[in-house]
Amino acid sequence: MRCLPVFVILLLLIASAPSVDAQPKTKDDIPQASFLDNAKRYLQVLESKRNCCRRQICCGRTK
């Protein structure tokens, strides 16, 4: 009988804990991976532009 109150309290705590499905995804939710992919792609574009201008072949300048 001593364990019954502890068992009931644990059941109440488990039932009130938020689950994974507590917040349904909306169309505005974007996975973290896509943010990282976009950041990598943006950095690659910047790097290619910097290398391009360093070689002066696509910045409108001639050697």
Curated annotation (Swiss-Prot):
Residues 23-48 form a propeptide. Residues 1-22 form the signal peptide. It is found in: Secreted. InterPro entries: T-conotoxin. One of its GO terms (molecular function) is toxin activity. The keyword Disulfide bond applies. Keywords: Cleavage on pair of basic residues, Disulfide bond, Neurotoxin, Secreted, Signal, Toxin. GO terms for cellular component: extracellular region. Contains 2 disulfide bonds that can be either 'C1-C3, C2-C4' or 'C1-C4, C2-C3', since these disulfide connectivities have been observed for conotoxins with cysteine framework V (for examples, see AC P0DQQ7 and AC P81755). Expressed by the venom duct. The cysteine framework is V (CC-CC). Belongs to the conotoxin T superfamily. This is Conotoxin TeAr193. It comes from Conus textile.
